[in-house]
């Protein structure tokens, strides 16, 4: 998985990352674009408490969704132009974390991302949000799922049920529920399950961890 500005890795199945429901750090959401940001009662954009340099997008209305797509579509275009095989859309679950966001609007934005990806020859994956996996696969039309720490939170069946083998499972070394060999032996783990360090450091760097279940 790589950012839309990166180049895919030769010989691999490459997934391009897009933050579809929150802003990317440093992205320009000033001017008219600011109408698509979720705001609190004082009018201040709402940030993700865990990622304070990311602000929450509000897809509740058609005009807000249009603005979001105007900003995000170029990134999706880069994914296709750079030769990626698929794209994963992060933070689908913002409407479950921020009640001011309308669920219907979030679902419509997801459908738009799916249509745009398929129209460019890209598969598209749901990122996390286990409680939405059935809807994501059955109603929205995501092709696969990417789950972080489903073993740690006992959620893997929620993904492998709707998506079958089309699940990429990522566990992190600082939050393993059991030795990684035991995670690999679990009957509900995804066919492609990997262990990473939390900071996703590159090979050769201090703290780098990468293991894959056989």
Give the location of each predicted region.
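Glycan-processing catalytic domains of CAZymes
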Residues: 1-214
